[in-house]
Structure formats: structure tokens, C-alpha cells
Amino acid sequence: MDDPLKFFEEQKIIAVIRAGEHSDADAIAKALIDGGIKIIEITPSVPQFTKLIENLAKLNQVLVGLGSATDGEQAYRAINVGAQYVSSHYTDKNIFTVCKNNNAVVIQGAATVTEAIEAYNLGIDLIKIYPINFLGEVPYINRLRRSFPFLKLVPSGGVTLDNFLDYIKAGATACVIGRNLCDKGLIRAHQWTEITERAKQFTQKLESLKVAR
């Protein structure tokens, strides 16, 4: 992927995979891709998460990254096998340094205006506003963007099919979507086709916005 940041701006949907079995995570990834999702985030909770990242990184037109990173060592391992971005819930300078030294996009979390500005000043590419469902939801993103239009914001935590487009219209660069795409019940029941259908609902909704514009 020549320009990952532009890809985030175009695709808008970041799908997060959490699973207790590697085979389940692999099946989820395939189901999401079948549903039109092109940005996939693998968390360290997935057994052999670097193996899955490596396999997904070989696919054309799929951007894969590490999510919920907690330290620079995790970030390096993921980037070393093909991850093009690393995301964490908070600002961590070690993760930031690893990403910048290895030409990977860095997404780090913020909750307050001060944290968001500090993240921007540090040089973080995308600022994850987390958990957005406890921070004011769409109006909070709208206010942040109105006051600080230079911030590239990625709401996470509680983004649903019903409010997804509202976040995009409010100025979010992209949205992180986890349980509303692949909840634990679907994973336990191996209902991969339902995950594909949910993915299609999100991607079709995004297409409807693009057409309207």
C-alpha cells in the first residue's frame, strides 16, 4: 500500500478482530473481506497474531494493522511481518518511535482536548477518540473538528450501523468497529456468513453516502 493514510481516508471502516482461537480469527478476516472490508486490525489476543498479520499483508487491496498494542516490542513484531499501522488505546512514545522508525502509520488514543492536541503535537497520524460512547458520541467529534479542523480523528468504542455515517459526516477520518461487526456470539457459533452480511451493511451504507455526495 503506497499511501496508507489516504487509504484510511477513502475506506473509513477499520474492522477489529478479537478471538481466542487463531482459526476463528482467520475465518473472521475472510468473512470481513468477503463483505467488502479492506482495513483489518488484529489484536494481540489472537493466538499467533503475527502469523495472521503476515498472511493478510500478502493480500492485494487489504490494509492490515496491529490493534490494542501495549508496547513497542509488539509493534515491532507486527510491522516486521507486514503490518502497515499500529493502534493503541493511549499515547505511548515507545510504540510511536517504533512506528516512525519503520514507516508505519501510528494511531493512538485520546479522550480529552488536551490529550488530542498533545498527540497531534507529538506527530501521531490518526488520533483515536476512545471510548467515544462515554465521551459524547457524535456531538463530541463534531465539536472537536469544528474547534480543531486539523485533527484526524478516529472514533472507537460504540460505533454502530445506526451512527456510523453520523461520525463520518461530523468529520471523522475513519471509524473503528469491533463488536458491532463480529460479536462474541457470532464467533462462538461460527456464523461467518452473518459477519459477512454485517460487513456488507456497513460498506453499502458508506457507498450510499459517497453516491449522495
What are these regions (language model features)?
Residues 113-127, 137-140, 144:
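Anionic-ligand binding region
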Residues 105, 111-118, 122, 191-201:
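Ligand-binding grooves and catalytic loops that recognize ribose/phosphate and carbohydrate rings
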Residues 16-18, 38-46, 63-70, 83-91, ...:
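Catalytic beta/alpha-barrel core
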Residues 1-81, 101, 150, 161-162, ...:
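Conserved N-terminal beta1-alpha1 strand-loop-helix module at the mouth
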Residues 89-95, 128-137, 172-191:
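Glycine-rich phosphate-binding active-site loops on the catalytic face of alpha/beta enzymes
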Residues 28, 95-99, 115:
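Aromatic/hydrophobic pocket-lining residues that form π-stacking "cages" and hydrophobic walls in ligand
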Residues 66-67, 155-158, 175-179:
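Glycine-rich beta-strand-to-loop/alpha-helix junction loops that act as flexible
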